[in-house]
Amino acid sequence: MTESANRALLPAGLRDMLPPDAEFEASVVHSLMSMFARHGYDRVKPPLIEFEESLLDGAGGGTSSQTFRVMDPMSQKMMGLRADMTPQVARIAATRLGSQPRPLRLSYAGQVLRVKGTQLRPERQFGQAGIELIGSDDAGADAEVLVMTAEALDDLGVPGVSADLALPTLVPAVFAAYGINGETADRLRAALDHKDSATVAAQGGAAAPLLQALIAAAGPAARALAELCALDLPPAAAAERDRLARVVELAGADLPSLTLTVDPVENRGFEYHTGLSFTLFARNMGAELGRGGRYQGGGGEPATGATLFMDSVLAALPGPKPAKRLFVPAGTPRAWAQAFRAQGWVTVSGLDPAADPQVEAKHQGCRHRLGPDGIVEVE
């Protein structure tokens, strides 16, 4: 391997983002943040690194295994590089914005770094953009966050946006009602995660028929809700189901084009969520575009939010359109170049007056150049 190749080698899961992708991501993030702002979400910007004890407090505890840690040479305290921005926004809401009126609407965008990638997302560093609605326990807050993030993807041009709704607190409510705990609960939880109805039947005892019915109820929202409503659920689980039905009703009224499915037993990735949660997908894409749901904010404050994963969002979009690049030969009056930029051109100025404009334009990736008689196409 050459010295140049060695210098370009990056750790697994990390990459350089090159033109035009870097600019494309920036423009997409700008569009998202502008859309969030128009809906009353104020932007915050937490630091990339902070003390471990605050970064991993509360909902942040769910990211502990994915957090890089370093020793702060100034304070001699452990610090963590954020693996997710939601816990940081929750901290800001509970502390620096603790006296602000509720509900509090915040937005954010930035890079996160994780210890390990996954099969569907091997990248360990990627961009996030999202919203948090803090201080409301109303089903309308859940619906607002779901609809806003799905609508934002629609506005960007993502095809066939859909949301898979989950109730990570539903199964624990059933377990509690039937006295299922310890190793039995762990085995059943693993079986439910893999939709293993046979193991549920063998291990579930009196709760087995109900748990099997929950597995079978997964599917389009209307059918899933009909099947869930036909089940004799314990009171706490029934309350979760009723809230789900209300959110589906509100979301369907606000964004009828959004395809909704329900998986009543899904839990993976929602470990710190305390209520209705969701995953966003696009047509013909296996990777999730984002996740959201209800969680407990700082001081036990009710909160809900959603995070979009920019690498997946960009992959779901048509590629960036080539910029209209115009080569302007050296010596061209500056006012002329300014006028062309005002018309939407990207101008690339020549540096060598003796250079051949046709050749230089090709070298600079310009499909047009400024000639003596105006703009001409580069052959």
From Swiss-Prot:
Look up the domain of life of the source.
Bacteria
Please give one Pfam family short name: tRNA-synt_His
Alphabetical list of InterPro entries matching this protein: aa-tRNA-synth_II (IPR006195), aa-tRNA-synth_II/BPL/LPL (IPR045864), HisRS-like_core (IPR041715), HisRS/HisZ (IPR004516), HisZ (IPR004517)
A Gene Ontology cellular component where this protein is annotated is:
cytoplasm
SUPFAM superfamilies, per database record: Class II aaRS and biotin synthetases
Q: Which UniProt keywords apply?
A: Amino-acid biosynthesis, Cytoplasm, Histidine biosynthesis
**What PROSITE patterns does UniProt report for this protein, alphabetically?**
AA_TRNA_LIGASE_II (PS50862)
* Any GO BP: histidyl-tRNA aminoacylation
Q: What is its main location?
A: cytoplasm
Q: State the pathway, as annotated in the record.
A: Amino-acid biosynthesis; L-histidine biosynthesis; L-histidine from 5-phospho-alpha-D-ribose 1-diphosphate: step 1/9
Annotated signal sequence is none
Q: What function does the entry list?
A: Required for the first step of histidine biosynthesis. May allow the feedback regulation of ATP phosphoribosyltransferase activity by histidine.
Q: How does it assemble?
A: Heteromultimer composed of HisG and HisZ subunits.
Family, as annotated? Belongs to the class-II aminoacyl-tRNA synthetase family. HisZ subfamily.
Q: What else is known?
A: This function is generally fulfilled by the C-terminal part of HisG, which is missing in some bacteria such as this one.
Under the heading HAMAP family, the entry gives: HisZ
- Which protein is depicted? ATP phosphoribosyltransferase regulatory subunit
Q: What is the lineage of its organism?
A: Bacteria, Pseudomonadati, Pseudomonadota, Alphaproteobacteria, Rhodospirillales
